């Protein structure tokens, strides 16, 4: 994945738009217009603060289905993402929770979004939805069938989950890239708002061998300068909201402060840590 081609920077900050509850979810309020307006406000605030990309998630649809979401969710997210792309110039991505990568890829391919996030691409994770199995085989075939160039960013040992058996981070990273054909990997802490530790990021980056590594949770103005030393980019949500509260709206002032803190951290980052990888879908397979 060529980060500069997608984001116009080798070290992108991707801000998250957490959608209000969508149709058929447990907390759906019956007003899609309100959901759209909130999403537009969030995207505008992120763009005003200077993010390099935006990812849209059905975050407030919890509790999530284990696999496929309802068609109404897909329809709503398609409508919203399309509108956001006409509102901001930053590239937009999609994450359909908990692990509906097929729907995310379909939406992205149809509206021209640039990337998707997949919580479990390979392996098996024990989650609050039950056991979730990665299905890279079907997803990569589906991308080929769609003639799509949407990049796949895959979590490794995803948050709010535990792997079956004894986890090995370097093996999981290698398998996700070489056997799951992920275009980039994401490393998170144990839960939303919890950062990965620096040692794990360094291990992941070394194992990735040039494939982009993103910080997937817990980054804030205080720690991003250190965390970015061992990663290529960051996906950030909680710390950009008013008072750092996940339930509040995006605060463009906090976004700007985060961007500035990361820029300061990048000044001390060795240039060799900047990587540019192959285009989506061109990795070799290890059997």
From Swiss-Prot:
InterPro entries given in the database record: BtpA, RibuloseP-bd_barrel
Protein family per UniProt: Belongs to the BtpA family.
PANTHER family: SGC REGION PROTEIN SGCQ-RELATED, ZGC:162297
Primary role: Regulates a post-transcriptional process during the life cycle of the PSI protein complex such as (1) translation of the psaAB mRNA, (2) assembly of the PsaA/PsaB polypeptides and their associated cofactors into a functional complex, or (3) degradation of the protein complex.
Protein name: Photosystem I biogenesis protein BtpA
Recorded name of the encoding gene: btpA
């Amino acid at each position: 994945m060529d980060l500069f081609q997608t984001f116009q920077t080798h070290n992108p900050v991707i801000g998250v738009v957490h959608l209000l509850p969508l149709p058929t979810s447990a907390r759906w309020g019956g007003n899609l217009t309100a959901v759209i307006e909130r999403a537009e406000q969030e995207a505008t605030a992120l763009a005003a603060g200077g993010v390099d990309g935006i990812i849209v998630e059905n975050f407030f649809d919890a509790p999530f289905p284990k696999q496929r979401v309802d068609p109404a969710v897909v329809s709503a997210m398609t409508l919203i993402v399309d509108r956001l792309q006409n509102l901001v110039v930053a590239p937009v991505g999609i994450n359909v929770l908990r692990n509906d990568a097929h729907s995310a890829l379909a939406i992205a391919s149809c509206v021209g979004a640039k990337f998707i996030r997949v919580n479990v691409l390979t392996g098996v994770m024990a989650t609050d939805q039950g056991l979730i199995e990665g299905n890279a085989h079907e997803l990569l075939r589906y991308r080929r069938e769609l003639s799509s160039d949407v990049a796949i960013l895959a979590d490794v040992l995803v948050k709010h989950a535990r792997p079956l058996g004894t986890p090995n981070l370097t093996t999981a990273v290698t398998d996700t890239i070489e056997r799951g054909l992920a275009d980039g990997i994401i490393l998170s802490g144990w839960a939303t708002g919890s950062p990965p530790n620096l040692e794990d990021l360094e291990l992941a980056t070394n194992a990735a061998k040039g494939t982009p590594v993103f910080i997937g949770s817990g980054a804030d103005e205080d720690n991003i300068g250190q965390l970015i030393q061992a990663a290529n980019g960051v996906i950030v949500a909680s710390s950009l909201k008013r008072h750092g509260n996940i339930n509040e709206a995006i605060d463009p002032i906090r976004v700007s402060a985060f961007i500035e803190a990361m820029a300061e951290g990048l000044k001390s980052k060795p240039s060799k840590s900047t990587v540019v990888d192959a285009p989506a879908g061109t990795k070799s397979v290890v059997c």
